Structure formats: C-alpha cells, structure tokens
A protein has these predicted regions:
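Short, hydrophobic secondary-structure boundary micro-motifs
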Residues: 111, 303, 326-327
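ABC-family P-loop ATPase nucleotide-binding domain
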Residues: 1-31, 321-333
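A general structural signal for well-ordered secondary-structure junctions
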Residues: 53, 108, 143, 173, ...
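Generic structural signal for isolated residues within well-ordered alpha-helices
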Residues: 94, 120, 135, 238, ...
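ABC transporter nucleotide-binding domain
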Residues: 192-281
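Short, charged/small-residue-rich alpha-helical element at the C-terminal edge
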Residues: 245-321, 333
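ABC transporter nucleotide-binding domains
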Residues: 22-27, 32-226, 232
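A short, structure-level motif marking secondary-structure boundaries and short turns
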Residues: 104, 117-119, 179-180, 242-245, ...
Length: 333
C-alpha cells in the first residue's frame, strides 16, 4: 500500500499576477453560441489568488465550453475573459504564461519515468530548476515512485503526476477538470489533500467537478451553473447557512397532516417531505413553536433538530427548480 508522504516546503513562487482590481481571472458577460444553441449565457466568474473556486453544473451545463474559452481554445460569441488584467483573445500569450490545466486524462511518455516526463516539460518551458521537479514530486506524493516508468503507474498516480505537470511553470491559475474522475476512494482523498495546498501557496484554482462532497470540502467559493447560466455564486459557508432548516420527525400516518398544519404558520417559509421526515424552513429557534403547533393539532413530534443543507442538497434544489421552470435550449458542453 502506497504511503502518503509528509508534504515538504512550499514549492510555489507565484508572484503578484492579479489585475489591479485583485482578480487573476475574470469573465465578463461571457457567451458562446453554436448556431441556435446558447451553450454559455452571460456568465460572470471571478477568481483571485490563493482560493479554490468550485465550478459546478449538471452534464451539458456549459462547464467545458467555459473552460475552453478561458484557455483560448474556444472563441466567445460575446463577452471577454481577462487573465491578470489582459483579455486573452487580444493577448493569447497570457494563457500559456499564467495558466496550467489538466483536462480529462493527462498524456505522458509511457516508457519514461515520472521524473523524466516532468523534466521534459521543464526543458520545453525553459528556466525551470531541477529542484522544482523534486519539490513538485514531493507535493503530489510521488517521490518514491518518480523513477518508475509511467506505464506502471496506477490511475491515481497518473492523475497526481498530471497535477505536478500543470505546476512546472508555476502558473498563477490552475484549472482542474474532474481531477478525481475514475479514482478509488484512496485516490480521491490524495487529490483532495493536494488541492488546498495549491491555494495555500498562492495559486488560483478553478475546480470543475461532479463530486459535490469533494467540492464542499476543498472549495472557498462555488459557482453553480445550468444551461450556461449562473444560478448561484458565493462562499461555501454562506450558501450552506442559507439552507438551514428544522428536521421534524412524525409518525408516517401523520406526516401529510403535519405538513399542512405547519405550512399555514406565518413564520414557516416552506415545508418539504424528504425521506419520511419534514424539512421545515423556519427560524432556528422555532423548534418549541413547531412542537406546540403540532400538539395543538393532535400530532406528536418524535424529533425536532436543526440541520443545514449539504452542497449536494443545495445543488439539486437549484438545478431541479430551474429544470421545472421549463427553460429551453439545453447546453451540450
């Protein structure tokens, strides 16, 4: 079993590469149309150094198209991408100078070692000291296997080497698109341990992932999109605090009556039934009022407890609400 090595000293020399307004990456009214289809619709995203932004959306929501426009691979129909204050379409060199990205499965020479693969990238980039390669291998917990041929690596090891490869040129922005896709739980945990360190060392990390619990654990902020439109953006803690509710347990035979009784109370915003319990959107100190109201109507509450939504619950609630709104023009990228 591979052992997780103790992280070494910081490996980043990321300088002050943000624009004067503090954002290292900023999209303004970013829009992409493919014929009649609008894949990305007036999207505004901001990212500063030293933070992780979780970029979330269902399949076909426009995440990949957005990443393509940030990297200069897809030309916007309207709007701009600013990297370190410069519009990437006007200054295409700014992308290679400041951005590292791992999209799907990274490609390496199979008969070369992990260390030599990174050295090859360093030679191509120029002015990368040998010590940086060793520091990066230590950062991604690959020092012990760095001399082995790439073709002998597990999927998790290949993914970690891919992250190291994005850091060879010490980019200000690191884009990780589904970095734990296909990994076993141990591999996912390894990647989760690496991502916060990137932010701690000054990198701005854009994390596109379907692993909602993973994003919740490592992100400072999240941006949730559907059909190319922004649904919600903000700090993880603030968004989850908005989803606080009271969970009320009642007998299954009484659950519909309890829901109807509570829904009539002026201090209750909403009542849902989930997994056989009532989820009541009401002030956190409303537990005694809920209990009293139910008793007065002949319903016994077996449990009343304050809860808060997980990021997964918030994501599902937002995307389901917008799906029910009957939007048209489903994005495909």
């Amino acid at each position: 079993m591979e052992q997780v090595q103790t992280p070494g000293p910081p490996v980043s020399g990321v300088g002050q590469r943000a624009a004067a307004n503090g954002w290292v990456l900023e999209t303004n009214s970013l829009t992409k149309q493919f014929g009649p289809l609008t894949a990305v619709d007036d999207l505004n995203i901001k990212l500063q150094q030293g933070e992780v932004l979780g970029f979330l959306g269902p399949n076909g929501s426009g995440k990949s198209t957005t990443v393509g426009m940030i990297l200069g691979l897809v030309r916007p129909s309207r709007g701009t991408v600013r990297i370190a204050g410069k519009i990437n379409q006007e200054h295409p060199e700014i992308v290679s100078q400041t951005t590292g990205a791992i999209i799907e499965n990274p490609a390496f020479y199979p008969y070369m070692s992990g260390r030599d693969n990174l050295r090859a990238l360093a030679i191509a980039a120029g002015n990368v000291p040998d010590q940086r390669i060793e520091d990066l291998l230590r950062l991604v917990n690959m020092s012990e296997r760095a001399g082995s041929k790439y073709k002998t690596y597990s999927l998790g090891m290949k993914q970690r080497l891919g992250i190291a490869a994005t850091l060879v040129t010490d980019p200000a922005i690191v884009i990780l698109d589904e970095p734990t896709n296909g990994l076993d739980p141990a591999g996912q945990r390894e990647i989760r341990g690496i991502i916060p360190r990137l932010a701690e060392e000054g990198h701005a990390v854009l994390l596109a992932s379907h692993m909602l619990h993973e994003v919740e654990q490592v992100s400072d902020r999240v941006a949730i999109i559907r059909r190319g439109k922004m649904l919600r953006e903000g700090r993880v803690g603030d968004l989850l605090a908005q989803g606080e509710y009271l969970e009320v347990g009642v007998d299954a035979a009484e659950i519909d009556r309890a829901r109807d009784v509570l829904a009539r109370m002026p201090w209750v915003e909403k009542v849902d039934v989930r997994d056989g319990t009532l989820h009541v959107a009401a002030p956190a100190d409303a537990g005694s009022a809920i209990n009293r109201t139910l008793v007065e109507n002949g319903v016994f509450a077996s449990r009343i407890a304050a809860q808060r939504n997980t990021l997964e619950e918030l994501f599902l609630e937002l995307t389901e609400i917008n799906a029910d709104a009957g939007e048209t023009g489903e994005a495909q990228a």
